[in-house]
Amino acid sequence: MAYNHKDIEQKWQQFWSDNETFKTVEDADKPKYYALDMFPYPSGQGLHVGHPEGYTATDIMSRMKRMQGYKVLHPMGWDAFGLPAEQYAMKTGNNPRDFTAKNIQNFKRQIQSLGFSYDWSREVNTTDPAYYKWTQWIFEQLYKKGLAYEKETLVNWAPDLMGGTVVANEEVVDGKTERGGFPVYRKPMKQWILKITAYADRLIDDLDLVDWPDSIKEMQKNWIGRSVGASVFFNVEDSEKQIEVFTTRPDTLFGATYLVISPEHDLVDQITTPESKAAVEEYKKAVATKSDLERTDLNKDKTGVFTGAYAVNPVNGKKIPVWISDYVLASYGTGAVMAVPAHDGRDYEFAKKFKIDMVPVYEGGNLEDGVLDSEGGLINSGFLDGMDKQTAIDTMISWLEEHGVGHKKVNYRLRDWVFSRQRYWGEPIPVIHWEDGETTLIPEDELPLRLPAATDIRPSGTGESPLANLDDWVNVVDENGRKGRRETNTMPQWAGSSWYFLRYVDPKNDQKIADEDLLKEWLPVDLYVGGAEHAVLHLLYARFWHKVLYDLGVVPTKEPFQKLVNQGMILGSNHEKMSKSKGNVVNPDDIVERFGADTLRLYEMFMGPLTESVAWSEDGLNGSRKWIDRVWRLMIDDENQLRDHIVTENDGSLDMIYNQTVKKVTDDYENMRFNTAISQMMVFVNEAYKADKLPAVYMEGLVKMLAPIIPHVAEELWSLLGHEGGISYAEWPTYDESKLVEATVQVILQVNGKVRSKITVDKDIAKEELEKLALADAKIQQWTADKTVRKVIVIPNKIVNIVVG
């Protein structure tokens, strides 16, 4: 008889809840294990079958570690601020708070139905004032350290998103917003910015301290984009102005025949001649509607306008024209580049189009044929002539420094983090702007600054957030009658998720972010599992905040997440990404109802390697359920009683396969190879079906190994095997090294190379002993009688060949 998943799952989930089975144990004598999932945004759609894949992986690790004697921290919470709730509220007139609370309730119900061993007493919610008090507190520490500042900056302005809001560079894809696909324009606006660039080197170098996939480390390094080169200063002719250029190729300075500066560069208006003014203004207007990606597309036609101004190349005194072009971004480097058209494809196209001189500085090739990529000896370069590239770079940097016209410099692709958002549904920034120009933080003892309730959360229309509409909240007066306005922008969704793993350690503490001793006890996170889509942003921001808190002495570790694993994507059965529009979304509620939570957990772990994307298959789901039924029937009869072939004695027939299974499953779990661990348990179950008697101790071991993957069934089987109190803290099975291989082997006996008999002997028996047994074998004696044994060839554990004549 098959097991009844509905009854069993409800029974054991109730048991875990009543007994607080998974409440985190604080025990100084136990080693710790902190297993963390990337907490979800509680959307209106609810959980999809992709979520449980990562959650099951961390749950397997957590359950195994408890059984191995670890104290385990395995929490869950909600990344609940965010755009969809605000968009929903604007459409329906409902409060995003109510919408979010309802979604959380649904998510929690779904997650609990899957039997994950979370400590729900540590649940966090980023929209809870008791939580975001500490998000605001971290902002205040950043401000005090000079890492949060206000600046008018060119931002990505999406006028059609939420009635107008700023989006981060990372949220712009192909010139449109990642969410909704709305066009993005560049617009100057005063913003709060976090100085993540101050930590750029540490964010690269400390990747050596963590066990992360190489691909993710590489993505982070590329995003930060550290490059070593030189700053070079070009004097503007007939002016006291200087244009600073960063270049990774100072060896090519003699070949610089023009400068290009960004249309937004501070000097554009100051150096443009009256004759060029109209053309420059017109060009600047045209560029304002283009995204950074469009502007830097290598395939697009090069455009630009001559400013009328000239600069002086410091190394040879030559006068070179200064152009503006959209391919130079104000936000990268100095917003100005020296163009060496003979050796750079983009500069070559530009110079060719606008008929600007080209000077080759490396020998080899012909400019008529296109840009020169040869790097032979230097030519046309004065004191650098004849040098190789690296010598020329070093020599030129020394020359620049000696003459006071440049210096060695490290540049980064990473920009400071535009932190403010023109939205309602986010953490208020705890700042007041006073009428006399002073900006102050809200005193720490007045935190949290609560997000006010509002019925109308449409954008203000001025570029400010909807909070600007709430006069009673915005306008303040201090004790001296000085008037001020609260900051009306809110924090991005990244804020609450940049430190949540710290709050799980001590979620109810109202005096500090978390107790120092508890942070020392639990950090770093031992295992962090989530989607690769967060490879750059969330992980970079969380690491940045963690390093700031480390410098403040708040956290004890340099890095927050020791091991990172990215689960693959579960695709639709048609091998496409699941989406409502394609009609291939699978709802876990339906699977739990029809097959049971354990089946879903088993199937998602058996589909393939955790880190690879795999297509959903109804057949695979059926197969997983059938195998659970097979395990059940191995031990339980139709009367729901333990089968009588489960006995206390052990005849030894399953010794080797059992010990091999314990070893492989343990190793595979530790290395998160769950699919091969399941395969090994299938092999063991097949062997167990062939055995006449099943040692109870081996059946208990099997159930313990199954418990992390199919915990409800395992609890029921454990109970039927005669145990009380649940399986969660039962001791993890161990294996006997001596039983991993057969104790005996079968040896083939040959006479003159022909097989005449076989004998079973102890493995690794001495050669002399094996020879004696072979010669004494009755069948062999029939072939050797009356013959002379000339030679005996012994291959241990395999063959004895007797040569007779």
Curated annotation (Swiss-Prot):
A motif ('KMSKS' region) lies at residues 577-581. The keyword Protein biosynthesis applies. It comes from Pediococcus pentosaceus (strain ATCC 25745 / CCUG 21536 / LMG 10740 / 183-1w). GO terms for cellular component: cytosol. This is Leucine--tRNA ligase. It catalyses: tRNA(Leu) + L-leucine + ATP = L-leucyl-tRNA(Leu) + AMP + diphosphate. One of its GO terms (molecular function) is aminoacyl-tRNA deacylase activity. Pfam families: Anticodon_1, tRNA-synt_1, tRNA-synt_1_2, tRNA-synt_1g. Belongs to the class-I aminoacyl-tRNA synthetase family. It is an enzyme of class 6 (ligase). Coiled coil: none annotated. The lineage of its organism: Bacteria, Bacillati, Bacillota, Bacilli, Lactobacillales. It is found in: Cytoplasm. Its EC number is 6.1.1.4.
